[in-house]
Amino acid sequence: SDYEKLLSAAVDANMNMIRVWGGGIYEEDIFYELCDKYGLLVWQDFMFACAMYPGNDSFLKSVEQEAIYNVKRIRTHPSLALWCGNNEVLSAWENWGWKNDIIENQSQEIADTIFKAYDQIFHKILPKVIQEYDIATDYWSSSPSSSTGIPESLTSGDAHYWGVWWGKEPFSTYEDKIPRFMSEFGFQSFPEFSSVKKYTNPSDYDIYSDVMKSHQRSSIGNSTIEEYMQRDYNVPLTKKHIELGDNFPNHVISSRFIILKELQLMI
């Protein structure tokens, strides 16, 4: 199965924990069974990520029911290591300007109402469900507990470090930014060239072609990959070369070397 291939590959890569991200899905039972089999710990997010949520009674009731169902379903797996309330919701509210934007453009009262819903879900409902149905497993209300650029992010709780990529810092930054627990970091690459060929024609062999751009979901994606390749690998990426297609396969392959370099350094 795809799960078997993925999780056995994680073990072969010497990984010991898998995070089920709050912007995804609660996984199928077979996923947790295979994590048990392979000895992989599971960091399990509840399915909340990168957004504020309603606080009306019907929504809060549905949150409670969904949490109870999944906690009861997953709790018996020895691979389960942690329940986490959400991905980046608190960090975004406090540090990405969300709260201040609401206060400035609407009102303090509306901001308070929005955060009251946050408090209800992540500090009351979910901890109560864990306390009642899975007291043996720890609960962490939000990941990360701080934000990139804030000193406390490296000394308290877990961290998501995106100075590399979003901040375009060199990979060597990772040698200095060492938090207590790094729960998220990353960098993009293009897929294997054999995969790229399945959705392109030779006339599309330009990372800024319409086809390549339509497969790039990050606003800074292709330009950031290109900047790091020129910085770290001195790949010649003039528009003339790209239009001719001469360098396109090497361009794609070089982006994968960047990922290799980052993972080797970070892990």
Task: Map each language-model feature to its residues.
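Short, solvent-exposed loop/turn and secondary-structure capping segments
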Residues: I30-F31, W93-W96, E192-S194
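Active-site neighborhood of glycoside hydrolase catalytic domains
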Residues: L34-K37, Y53-E152, H251, E262-L263
